Amino acid sequence: GGICVLPQGSDYDAFFEDTMHAGHYENRRESVDIMIRSSRSVINDLLAMGVDFERKTDGSLDFTREGAHSRPRIAFHADITGKEITTKLLQAVRKLDNVQILEHVAMTDILTGERDGATVCTGVVAVSVDEDNSVRPADELANAAEDVHVGEPFKIHARHTLWATGGIGGVYDHSTNYPQLTGDACYIAQEHGIK
């Protein structure tokens, strides 16, 4: 696997057609256009974070052809592009002083409240799923009231909540996605009327 990128401007029309065709022409044309036009800046950002995409002997990116693509336009790292990207992104996030990472924690619901006459998300309900360690200290779990035991829900309050929910590939019998990608956040959003 890898990431589709517009290797040169002259490839735009073919890239657009390949993407529309792969999506059975049900894709939002505007979204496809944005994806293609922003692809190079996304790759440049990842390169700046240290992602090690494969390169040709002259140092330029090496592209491969996959799936519905009619030309080589996939930036990749061996056969573990996703791992390479997530490893480098996690390293970058761990350097941020204003970010707390809660590992082995899953969101089970959201907290809502009123702000300026509107219902807003004020945090999440989560559960520790770390089976190797039955108790996680409260200070590691964003102001939980006491020690949190595996399977016990706890609340995380926030002024602003951003959902980076992943995909839904894990709900299908045949998928190359991680089985943990079950779309739980999509369900929770639907239950709360979030669009």
Where are these regions (language model features)?
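Glycine-rich phosphate/diphosphate-binding loops that line cofactor/substrate pockets in enzymes
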Residues: 95-98, 155-159
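Residues at the start of alpha-helices and the adjacent loop-to-helix junctions
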Residues: 31-34, 150, 177, 181
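Conserved N-terminal/central alpha/beta ligand/cofactor-binding core
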Residues: 1-122, 127-147, 164, 168-171
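Short, mixed charged/polar active-site loops
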Residues: 135, 150-155
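Glycine-rich loop(s) and the adjacent beta-strand/alpha-helix scaffold that form part
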Residues: 160-195
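Conserved structured core elements
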Residues: 40, 83, 155-156, 179-183
